[in-house]
């Protein structure tokens, strides 16, 4: 019997073990998509206790922050909400999580133990009985160990690049301060997330467009030309601040062509307080997406598209706690044709940007895999990417399926690899988790005689997927 999470964790063959230890284990990390606050990096925040890091709490504006994965585990174990997002003492909240964790057999939440081993040197197993021991150990280190500040965690994880997620109206003041601080050796760059400027059919759109106008020094954005001009202005500002990628979180990918005059009329209608039809919303969104895609191409910014998430489906809890509190699910929208149409429209004028496509529904993997091959060109290997297994899929089965599907339909060797998509500074162990799964998958193919035992080729593939491909793709 293998020991729990030993040095050969998830590496089930001699070839897998060799590939991991020789080529994957010590590679730098390019965390090109995450949700960590740049302010906490600049201020080098030190956390008071492990519950703050893992379970989060409330922001000054009343919204919630924390790890949705852990919240869902606790809810699934019958833990009252007051211990999850409520105001119970942190020690009690941590106890409830520790008691729930043993029930998570087969769940990737067990990477919690990988975090304890990697950052705190704890080789035991967290459960209700060991919670006090772990609480005391972690809190002592968090409060006193210089390696366990925010920057210390990033540095000891060998992170070379962090791409945060930022709204177009953000001043990027913390990014500016990070760039000017010579003691910060890793790169932190903003990513352009213009969802609120596309959500013409959702509450708060007109108010947001007023904020976008203010961000570009205007009293208002009176027409669709004003909107595209403002977005271009902000993209260029982000590019000056080192932006390498955009990100679009869409319920589904729209594609409905319209003239500028039609789109302007739709925009004017909504800004006047009227409601647009779903078809009108799609016309506006398509027009803006095409404009943005052309700007990304011009500036060398990669376009990330995340879709097929149905958000806030528990109406009662969504009303009580707000969005992004763990009440989202996989959707079943079918929009492969629309993705292809969007890329084709951009390709017509040779303005299709580097694009990474993520669907929350793993049933879309084959369709995405076939889309990729339709729009590749000589600009860069793997210009159109199938994004890493996302959110509800970033576990062993999901990662193996995504990479196997990509290998079957495209070139796995050009894959840009893993990202944390996380709000936690302890989450860099997810890259290690991914690398072990990657090496085990490739190692098994070699062991089974499905790929030659070519050391040079295997080294290039493993190092590429772990870091080198992302380094090239994002111009690091």
Each model region followed by its residue ranges:
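Short glycine/proline- and charge-enriched loop/turn segments
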Residues: 318-326
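Short secondary-structure transition/capping segments
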Residues: 43-44, 316-318
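Metal-cofactor-binding active-site regions of metalloenzymes
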Residues: 2-299, 351-353, 357-369, 373-476
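C-terminal amphipathic alpha-helical interaction region
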Residues: 303-305
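Hard-cation-handling environments
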Residues: 309, 314
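Divalent-cation-assisted or electrostatically stabilized phosphate/pyrophosphate-binding catalytic cores
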Residues: 332-339
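Short, basic/hydrophobic alpha-helical segments
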Residues: 342-348
């Amino acid at each position: 019997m293998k020991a729990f999470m030993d040095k050969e964790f998830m590496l089930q063959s001699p070839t897998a073990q060799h590939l991991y230890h020789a080529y994957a284990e010590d590679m730098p990390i390019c965390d090109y998509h995450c949700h960590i606050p740049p302010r906490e990096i600049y201020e080098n925040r030190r956390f008071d206790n492990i519950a703050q890091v893992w379970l989060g709490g409330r922001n000054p504006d009343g919204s919630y922050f924390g790890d949705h994965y852990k919240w869902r585990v606790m809810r699934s174990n019958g833990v009252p909400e007051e211990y999850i997002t409520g105001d119970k003492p942190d020690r009690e909240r941590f106890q409830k999580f520790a008691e729930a964790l043993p029930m998570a057999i087969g769940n990737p939440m067990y990477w919690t133990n990988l975090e304890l081993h990697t950052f705190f040197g704890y080789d035991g197993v967290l459960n209700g009985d060991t919670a006090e021991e772990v609480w005391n150990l972690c809190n002592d280190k968090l409060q006193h160990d210089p390696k366990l500040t925010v920057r210390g965690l990033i540095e000891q994880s060998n992170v070379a690049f962090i791409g945060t997620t930022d709204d177009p109206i953000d001043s990027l003041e913390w990014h500016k301060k990070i760039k000017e601080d010579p003691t910060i050796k890793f790169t932190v760059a903003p990513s352009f997330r213009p969802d609120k400027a596309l959500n013409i059919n959702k509450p708060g759109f007109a108010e947001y467009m007023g904020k976008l106008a203010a961000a570009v020094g205007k009293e208002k954005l009176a027409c669709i030309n004003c909107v595209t001009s403002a977005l271009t202005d902000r993209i260029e500002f982000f590019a000056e601040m080192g932006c390498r990628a955009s990100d679009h979180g869409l319920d589904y990918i729209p594609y409905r062509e319209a003239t500028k005059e039609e789109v302007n009329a739709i925009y004017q209608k909504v800004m006047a307080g009227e409601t647009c039809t779903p078809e009108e919303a799609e016309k506006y969104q398509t027009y803006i997406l095409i404009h943005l895609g052309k700007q990304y191409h011009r500036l060398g910014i990669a376009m990330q598209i995340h879709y097929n998430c149905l958000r806030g489906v528990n109406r009662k809890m969504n009303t009580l706690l707000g969005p992004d509190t763990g009440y989202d699910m996989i959707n079943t929208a079918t929009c492969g044709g629309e993705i292809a149409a969007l890329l084709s429209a951009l390709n017509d004028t040779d303005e299709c940007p580097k694009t990474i496509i993520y669907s929350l529904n793993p049933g879309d993997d084959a369709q995405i895999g076939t889309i990729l091959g339709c729009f590749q060109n000589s600009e860069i290997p793997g210009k159109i990417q199938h994004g890493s297994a996302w959110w509800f899929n970033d576990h062993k089965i999901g990662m193996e399926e995504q990479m196997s599907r990509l290998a079957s339909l495209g070139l796995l060797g050009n894959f840009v690899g893993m990202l944390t998509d996380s709000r936690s500074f302890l989450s860099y162990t997810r890259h290690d988790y991914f690398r072990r799964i990657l090496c085990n998958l490739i190692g098994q193919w070699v062991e089974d005689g499905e790929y030659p035992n070519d050391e040079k080729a295997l080294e290039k593939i493993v190092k590429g997927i772990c870091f080198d491909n992302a380094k090239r793709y994002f111009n690091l």
